[in-house]
Amino acid sequence: MSKGIIAILVGPEYEDLEVWYPKLRLEEAGYDAPLVGIGDASYRGKWGYPATVDRQVGDMDAASLAGVLAPGGWAPDKLRRDPAVLSLVRTVHDQGGLVATICHGPWILISAGIVRGRTLTSTVGIRDDVVNAGAHWVDQPTVTDGNIVSARVPKDLPAFGAAMVQFLASHEP
């Protein structure tokens, strides 16, 4: 029996490792981790690995989710433009569910309007975006601030996976 559902947002040129490592880690911890997209049935990652979408964002019920993961790559730049993506992330956040993000994924959180006053990390390439959105950026492998768990880059995936699972374990019903 699943402990809950963590929607993993995917789009064109997603960062391969930042989707697949967390997906497997969450599934090992007992969660369903469907790949959720906004259009195509499948996407290629930056390094060419295919990802077949399990569900469309518009078909997701945010109230049924334990969390959402916004991986990096170039996909967040496209996903952040979709109102359904932003609504899903904002609703999960407002319900107190896990909002996990790594690398360029915080672009989605910025566009959803949920980072002001929060502390998070990301790839240094979007540090200015994070700061200009009103968040406090730190250069650490992973940061947990309330229900937002963030990480910098693929080398931080082990710590990121552990932080996500720790958050979820501390919020199990």
Residue ranges of predicted features:
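Extended, subdomain-level signal for the structured scaffold at the beginning of enzyme domains
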Residues: 1-99, 108-119, 127-173
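Catalytic nucleophile serine of serine hydrolases
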Residues: 103
